[in-house]
Amino acid sequence: MIQQKHDLYPNLCTQFIDNSHPELYEIIKLSIGNPTNAKIHAVLENYKTLNHHLIGCLLDNRLIGIIGIQLIGLDVNIKHISVQPEYRYKSVARHLVYAVIRNFKVVSIAAETDDESIGFYNKLGFKCQLTENVYGRRYQCILDV
């Protein structure tokens, strides 16, 4: 992957992550509602399929953030994004979104989110629309690249 310097962490490494990475289970469960072992394993199995990718941020060889995406033609759907609690609000998630933009030829990025994360997507320039589904109040967010 192409590396881009991070302001706070100059030794931050962004790379593709295999779904068997030893730290992946603990970090991806942060982005899964009501995570159970079965649910987490099912999510990780999806990343074995074609057009699904995991990109991680490693700091001193420790996985501190992850973004899971699905490529659909020239579009990307963010399926999961999570950052270890001690590294939140330090631009790690933004760094992950930019890694997707730098490394895939895409025209748009979509994500579904909640009230807790809507500000993150707005700051990155996503256009977000309120929707309701079985999970309650959600937002459909789109970024034209």
Regions found by a protein language model. Name each.
Residues 115-138:
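Conserved active-site alpha-helix within GNAT-family acetyltransferase domains
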Residues 52, 136-142:
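Short hydrophobic/aromatic beta-strand or adjacent loop that forms the aromatic wall/cage
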Residues 1-42:
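Short amphipathic alpha-helix that is part of the acyltransferase structural core
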Residues 68, 95, 99, 110, ...:
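Hydrophobic, well-ordered beta-alpha structural blocks that scaffold small-molecule cofactor pockets
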